[in-house]
Amino acid sequence: MKIKAVLNRDGGTFKTTDMQTYCESATRAFAAKGHELVCDVVPGAEIVDALESASGEAGLDALLAGGGDGTISTAAGIAWKAGLPLGVIPAGTMNLFARSLKLPLDIWKVLDLLAGAKVANVDIATANGRPFVHQFSAGLHARMVRMRNQMDFASRIGKIRASTSAAFGVMLDPPRFEVVFDIDGDGRSDERPISAISVSNNPLGNNSLFFADRVDTGKLGVYLAEPLEPTGVGKLAFDILRGKFKENEAVTASTAERVHLHFPKYRKGAACVLDGELLRMPPDVEIKIHAGELKVLVAPEQPTA
């Protein structure tokens, strides 16, 4: 197989990695399995162009992407549109999609697995046509990300500290807004006040990091939190930390294949988060699951005794 690896040298672990040595190790690992790997290391500002350029190369059989969740989300959308299998090298802070794919989270150990991987079909979702592999969210999460982005941090530990500080800030002043939602186009729109909404690519698992245990169910996870006071946000945060947020009395959980969201009291400057990226929120959001349309590299099945 002819494979191209595009690595974000500004992404998490790669900031402190000798990238020449890493690419040499990757090339050897794939050559040992009979593959031809070309490694391209680029700064974060050039990652989108590099991924798009790689996806258009003639004769390419698979695309590898290395970086944080933002890089992987971008790569997934590009690979999906190009019809290429995507290999994930988890070099970020959370590495949520890599966790869902049950990949090693060590950038060195994952090379041997990807070199001998099989291709699997998993789901990808879109929000107003924009692909994502983790989640769309508004309310509590968006406010926290906005506050975190206003802080200075230059390392993984710094980002975690900034996130913790932002979480406390949101806890003291939780948002409240109206949403009208229609699930699966059944025509029964429901309007309610909430403090948070999250729509995930597959239902989230019982874990504290908010990632899906599987990404091949063909369903979105839909989660709404009713209007919360600071004490309610604190209780929700505690339930999230122990991996039991769906048991929180303020949370309503369901699944769907398509969700339409309308924000009747939309105001300019309102924000949402899509796979960790803070974006301006439109007044209407159409979210769809594209079941089995993304090809990914995963661990080969182990023979049974």
For the regions a language model picked out, list residue spans one by one:
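ATP/nucleoside-binding phosphotransfer catalytic cores, i.e., glycine-rich phosphate-binding loops
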Residues: 16, 185-187, 191, 224-305
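Short, well-ordered alpha-helical microsegments
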Residues: 47-48, 72-73, 206-207, 281
